[in-house]
């Protein structure tokens, strides 16, 4: 198994850690940007499937107004 000859300096360890953190931050920013563009549905680079349309419009409005109509 490979074993390092000398102890790695704190400066070198810090540089490597900073590189890893920077790459993680860049990936997180990219993912957030991609998520934001998907939620706005304004970008042209993605395919947005059409929303399913219910044939019976009463299914979507179930429960609304029934209690209010009964009280009157």
Curated annotation (Swiss-Prot):
<keyword id="KW-0150">Chloroplast</keyword>
<feature type="region of interest" description="Disordered">
    <location>
        <begin position="49"/>
        <end position="72"/>
    </location>
</feature>
<dbReference type="GO" id="GO:0006412">
    <property type="term" value="P:translation"/>
</dbReference>
<dbReference type="InterPro" id="IPR044958">
    <property type="entry name" value="Ribosomal_bL32_plant/cyanobact"/>
</dbReference>
<dbReference type="GO" id="GO:0003735">
    <property type="term" value="F:structural constituent of ribosome"/>
</dbReference>
<keyword id="KW-0934">Plastid</keyword>
<protein>
    <recommendedName>
        <fullName>Large ribosomal subunit protein bL32c</fullName>
    </recommendedName>
</protein>
<keyword id="KW-0687">Ribonucleoprotein</keyword>
<comment type="similarity">
    <text>Belongs to the bacterial ribosomal protein bL32 family.</text>
</comment>
<dbReference type="InterPro" id="IPR002677">
    <property type="entry name" value="Ribosomal_bL32"/>
</dbReference>
<dbReference type="GO" id="GO:0015934">
    <property type="term" value="C:large ribosomal subunit"/>
</dbReference>
<dbReference type="GO" id="GO:0009507">
    <property type="term" value="C:chloroplast"/>
</dbReference>
<keyword id="KW-0689">Ribosomal protein</keyword>
<dbReference type="Pfam" id="PF01783">
    <property type="entry name" value="Ribosomal_L32p"/>
</dbReference>
<feature type="compositionally biased region" description="Basic and acidic residues">
    <location>
        <begin position="59"/>
        <end position="72"/>
    </location>
</feature>
């Amino acid at each position: 198994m490979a074993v390092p000859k000398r102890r790695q300096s704190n400066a070198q360890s810090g540089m490597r850690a900073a590189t890893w953190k920077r790459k993680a931050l860049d990936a997180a920013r990219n993912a957030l940007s991609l998520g934001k563009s998907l939620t706005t549905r304004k970008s042209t680079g993605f395919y947005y499937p059409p929303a399913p349309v219910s044939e019976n419009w009463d299914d979507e409005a179930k429960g609304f107004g029934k209690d209010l109509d009964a009280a009157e």
